[in-house]
A protein has these predicted regions:
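Short, glycine-/aromatic-enriched active-site segment of Class I SAM-dependent methyltransferases
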Residues: 137-161
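A short His-aromatic
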Residues: 112-116
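Conserved N-terminal segment of class I S-adenosyl-L-methionine
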Residues: 1-102, 107, 111, 124, ...
């Protein structure tokens, strides 16, 4: 499975920066409220963007004030991310031991990555280990993802590990024990007159996207 230049071009990823950025902000607002912590003020804090792709999330984090490091398994993606942002970017696999110090990041983000991984539980454990604060992830919901994405002509065959909320709860309980919350949402986005309209709607069980927030217990 390759996540190099052709993958991003086939997915028209370069045209999605404003959509990705809006999605990231909505999820961080939700996670801040849910975990009772201010993730929108990154001044004096460090953030890690797991699966940074072209660096759109990393740029949002940097704009919020975080000292940001991003990494991706794609060398091409990490190179583009470095060109798009002033953040630091690495090439590595989230499923293996990360070349980063334990308990060193106030915020770890992982947006729409877990579904691509053969062993997402290893990635979750690695993210938890390097975090000293909050881990925020999003991933498609198996209950509805294949049907809706095919109807929208947007299904990604590299989604090899799509799970339900119940399945993620079991994985998180085994992997990190406690301190996590999951909810499902459906994001509605459309353009009108050149302006992007974006609305997140919480739909229990059947939302298209599973949101995960983990607050590390000290």
């Amino acid at each position: 499975m390759s996540f190099e230049e052709n993958y991003f071009k086939d997915r028209k990823y370069s045209a999605k920066e404003d959509l990705v950025s809006r999605h990231v902000m909505e999820v961080l607002k939700w996670a801040s409220k849910t975990a009772h912590t201010d993730l929108l003020n990154g001044n004096g804090k460090r953030a890690l963007d797991v699966g940074c792709a072209l660096g759109y999330t990393s740029r949002v984090l940097s704009d919020l004030g975080y000292e940001t490091i991003g990494f991706d398994i794609s060398s091409w993606g990490a190179k583009q991310a470095k060109n798009n942002s002033c953040s630091q970017f690495l090439v590595c696999d989230a499923q293996v031991a990360l070349p980063l110090a334990l308990d060193s990041f106030d915020l770890v983000t992982c947006f729409d990555v877990l579904e691509h991984l053969a062993c997402p539980e290893k990635a979750i454990r690695n993210m938890f280990d390097v975090s000293k604060g909050t881990v925020v992830c999003t991933t498609p919901n198996k209950k509805v993802e294949r049907l809706i994405r095919k109807l929208l002509w947007d299904y990604d065959e590299t989604h090899i590990n799509v799970k339900t909320l119940a399945a993620w709860r079991k994985i998180l309980a085994v992997t990190i024990g406690e301190g996590f919350i999951l909810e499902s949402f459906y994001d509605v986005a459309f353009r009108l007159g050149g302006r992007l309209f974006f609305k997140s709607i919480r739909i229990p069980t059947y939302g298209l996207t599973v949101r995960i927030v983990v607050k590390k217990q000290r």
